[in-house]
Amino acid sequence: MRIYQPTLLIFTTVVLLSISAVAPGGSRQLLYTRDDPITIPPYLIFENVRLERAYVALQAWKRAMISDPWNLTTNWFGSRVCDYNGVVCSESLDDPLVKTVSGVDLNQGDIAGHLPEELGLLTDIALFHVNSNRFCGTLPVGFSQLSLLFELDLSNNRFAGKFPEVVIGLPKLKYLDLRYNEFEGELPESLFDKDLDALFLNSNRFRSKIPVNMGNSPVSVLVLASNRFEGCIPPSFGKMGKTLNEIILMDNGLQSCIPNDMGLLQNVTVLDISYNWLVGELPKSMGQMENLEVLNVERNMLSGLIPDELCSLEKLRDFRYGSNYFTGEPATCRYLENYNYTMNCFKDVRDQRSMMECKMFLSKPVDCDSFKCSPGSSCFSPPPSQISPSSQPLAPAPSPTSPPLSTPPPARPCPPVYSPPPPPPLSLAPSMN
């Protein structure tokens, strides 16, 4: 009987699992410990050594699963690993005569457990999709061996801890989806220097300022919604104009004016900065966002006049600007397919704030420089309120309350997050060259 114990991987594993990984509402008290190596029965014959390594990785992973309600891994035995449910095989990139495991897709399996270090033996995989399960713990260091990994989807699980920086070193990674987990702390600046195409971090517990180098990222889709980010919208994001198509920053604690460089995002089709604490006017430069289709700035403390150029954008069809302190809107806004103008300070218009509330708020000027975001982070200052980050409370939870001085709205579910679906399951990644 062969014992597989490669030197690059540590097989001793101690992982604290949560009872909630098995049933909702439990407390963390289940300790899973394993220090025995994976053994390969002598009667198993493998087509090549890479498939043998894949067998070890998958058997270790199966051991790390404590619940598989749909029995997806019941056929995970024997040497024919390419026949395992959720396992994709193809020709090796460096040798077309060698078959290897090129992807794993266990999406929507409701499997509970953790990811073992041995998964680092799957050195040929391009796709790793495990969304909508109950995996917990952290991303193992062994993932640093996955030099061909192109798509990593860990969304809708119970992973926790700091941002898994092991992904920063994956040279081929283009698609990273960590949404709907329990990751926390700060985002590393190096994340935005990485050559990603899509980045989904929404609905976690990240709490920090957004790194100032966010604009270095070449992503086409960036979703940071429903976390606890605070401070400024980094002015550097104007540099993303050539690549960015969708940006979702809603439901955080951002406090600043909107940078004038917003107008440089001329390829953006969806922009959502609702449910924050943004102040000042909408920059007139936003009238240059010629591809904009959906714009949501609801539930902030914005004021002044809505630029004529904005509602005249040819492709704009959905503009939500309710629950702010705007004092004027062009008539063209009311001709859009979808719009929301309520709870502002428009005169002689129904469903607005009271005159007293508007007067109190608008009597204090906004000083965009007080936020000290950086040069270029100015906005056109109307007469609205002087609100500094130190005096204005941060949104304490993923669903911020309405701004101060306003009548609190009735309780409502968290707002939707515009984001495209994950990549098609079992799809082959683009060229790894």
Swiss-Prot record:
UniProt note on tissues of expression: Expressed in flowers and pollen.
Signal peptide start-end: 1-21
Listed GO MF terms: structural constituent of cell wall
Region Disordered: start-end pairs: 380-433
Regions of compositional bias (Pro residues) in chain numbering: 395-427
UniProt modification remark: Hydroxylated on proline residues in the S-P-P-P-P repeat.
Record-level GO cellular component terms: extracellular region
Alphabetical UniProt keywords: Cell wall, Cell wall biogenesis/degradation, Glycoprotein, Hydroxylation, Leucine-rich repeat, Repeat, Secreted, Signal
Principal subcellular localization: secreted
Glycosylation (residues): N71, N267, N340
GO biological process, one term: cell wall organization
Database matches in InterPro entries: Leu-rich_rpt, LRR_dom_sf, LRR_extensin-like_regulator
Ranges of the LRR repeats in the UniProt entry: 98-122, 123-145, 146-170, 171-194, 196-217, 219-239, 241-265, 266-289, 290-313
Domain of life of the organism encoding this protein: Eukaryota
Classification via Pfam families: LRR_1, LRR_8
Region: Contains the Ser-Pro(4) repeats, residue numbers: 381-433
Location within or outside the cell: Secreted, Cell wall
Database matches in Gene3D superfamilies: Ribonuclease Inhibitor
Function text: Modulates cell morphogenesis by regulating cell wall formation and assembly, and/or growth polarization.
PANTHER family: LEUCINE-RICH REPEAT EXTENSIN-LIKE PROTEIN 3-RELATED, LEUCINE-RICH REPEAT EXTENSIN-LIKE PROTEIN 7
Protein name: Leucine-rich repeat extensin-like protein 7
Organism: Arabidopsis thaliana (Mouse-ear cress)
